[in-house]
Structure formats: structure tokens, C-alpha cells
Amino acid sequence: LDHNNLTRMPGPLPRSLRELHLDHNQISRVPNNALEGLENLTALYLQHNEIQEVGSSMRGLRSLILLDLSYNHLRKVPDGLPSALEQLYLEHNNVYSVPDSYFRGSPKLLYVRLSHNSLTNNGLASNTFNSSSLLELDLSYNQLQKI
């Protein structure tokens, strides 16, 4: 479903779905129930859309390993990341902060890309990225003065 003119999340979607490619569309938001029942979904590609908010729509995605929300208009990081998540791509958005201990619920997280956002030191707590599993953390092109 990538490279279309979709303006909203399609549905209902097959519960057996493992990968969902909705990149390069014009989707502006992900309603809380849009991904309900997709417990087998391992990869969700939503990059290059107009998404401003995802709310808690990711909470039920128990098998999700990869989430790509890069090149959107997000100001906040998604609520309730799935515990199986390994790759989170949020570069080229307008994210200005990451909550304290935000990644604690995702112990398998290996890659976090937050480059080209609006992050400042006030928006990052000192323990935000304290994770022993993290292999790559990209915070380039923000307004950070120290880490």
C-alpha cells in the first residue's frame, strides 16, 4: 500500500499480517484502534507521511520489531512502545522531548534514530537512553548542547 494517496489508515486489516507498508502516502494520524488485533505484525513502515500523532496505537503490537515513523510531523514520541521492538526510526520529525525512562518498556531495543528533530537538553532526562541493549543511537542534527 506504499506510494499511494491514502489519507487515513486502511481497515480492517488481516490479523495474519506480518509486514505493513504504508510509507509515502498522506496519512495524518494513526487512530488508537487502527492496528487493533495485529498481534503478528513484525514491521510497520509509516515513513514519508503527514503523521502528527500516533497516540497509543502501538500498544497491542506484541510482535513488532521494526517501527519506521521517519519523515513525518510528529512532535511527541509514540506512547507505549511494544516490548519486542528492536528498531525505532523517528528521524526527520519535530520531536522536542523524550520522556524520562521512555525506553524502559522496550528492553530489546537495538537501534534508535532521532536525528533531524527539535530535541533540546531540556527535553531529555539524563537516564533517557540508559539501555544495555542499545547498539546505535543517532541524535545528530538536533539542538543539543550536551548528552
Curated annotation (Swiss-Prot):
* Protein purpose: Affects the rate of fibrils formation. May have a primary role in collagen fibrillogenesis.
Instruction: Describe where the LRR repeats fall, as residue ranges on this chain.
Output: 1-15, 16-37, 40-61, 63-84, 85-105, 108-128, 133-147
Q: Which domain of life is it from?
A: Eukaryota
- Annotated keywords: Extracellular matrix, Glycoprotein, Leucine-rich repeat, Proteoglycan, Repeat, Secreted, Sulfation
Q: How is it modified after translation?
A: Binds keratan sulfate chains.
- Designated name of the protein: Fibromodulin
- What gene is this protein a product of? FMOD
InterPro entries under this entry?
Leu-rich_rpt, Leu-rich_rpt_typical-subtyp, LRR_dom_sf, SLRP
Q: Which residues are glycosylated?
A: N5, N40, N130
Q: Does the keyword Repeat apply?
A: yes
Quaternary structure annotation from Swiss-Prot or TrEMBL: Binds to type I and type II collagen.
Which compartment or compartments is the protein found in? Secreted, Extracellular space, Extracellular matrix
Q: What else is known?
A: Incorrect gene name (LUM) has been attributed by Ref.1. LUM and FMOD are two different genes but members of the same family.
PANTHER family the UniProt entry points to: AGAP008170-PA, FIBROMODULIN
Q: Which family does it belong to?
A: Belongs to the small leucine-rich proteoglycan (SLRP) family. SLRP class II subfamily.
Which PROSITE patterns does the entry mention?
A: LRR
Provide GO CC annotations from the record.
Answer: extracellular space
Q: Which organism is it from?
A: Sus scrofa
